[in-house]
A protein has these predicted regions:
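Calmodulin-binding IQ motif helices
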Residues: 173
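Long, low-complexity, Ser/Thr/Gly/Pro-rich intrinsically disordered segments that act as flexible linkers
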Residues: 1-170
């Protein structure tokens, strides 16, 4: 049986977000990455929380990690070895298999997303532009108080009419 309160909402639900931002992060030291995670984990919405409060919530936070990001957090080698080879290789190394060639080659990815020091993505979704500004501002203030976590790049997202939700899919890193 699935424990919906232990699964991030992004895996199982779609929120009524019409805007958002992906913030691509790098950790200088394991302790700094863990400190960032410890401070944001309570803001990450579970699938159960979204099911219970989707109508009243205005914004949603998720996090995703790359395999190098898990290593950068200090996850032990035995645990890292349990992940599928495809995840360990990463998207840039698998670009041929994924069809990311030519103009879509990792060397052309905007924001340096093929960099080996891409460790995590903070996924900040909001119901409207005002809430996006609020959630991104809060995360920026949090990052300013959390040394050793660098923003490599960001990607702002907005709904495309006539849809009433942002075309924000799952993040695969």
């Amino acid at each position: 049986m699935l424990e919906f309160d232990d699964i991030q909402h992004l895996v199982l639900t779609r929120v009524p977000a019409i805007t958002g931002r992906y913030e691509f992060l790098s950790f200088r030291q394991p302790s700094q990455g863990r400190a960032w995670l410890a401070g944001i984990i309570d803001k990450v919405a579970s699938a159960q929380a979204v099911r219970d409060g989707v109508d009243s919530e205005r914004r949603w936070v998720s996090v995703a990690f790359t395999w190098p990001g898990l290593r950068a957090l200090g996850v032990d080698e035995a645990s890292l070895a349990t992940f599928p080879e495809e995840f360990r290789q990463g998207m840039a190394a698998r670009s041929q298999v994924l069809g990311d060639t030519g103009v879509n080659h990792p060397d052309r990815w905007i924001g340096g997303l093929a960099r080996p020091d891409l460790h995590a993505i903070a996924i900040l979704f909001a119901r409207n532009a005002q809430e996006r500004q609020r959630v991104t501002g809060e995360h920026a203030a949090y990052l300013a108080r959390t040394p050793g976590v660098d923003v490599l790049s960001t990607l702002d997202l907005d709904a495309i009419p006539p849809f009433d939700y942002a075309q924000i899919g799952r993040v695969h890193v």
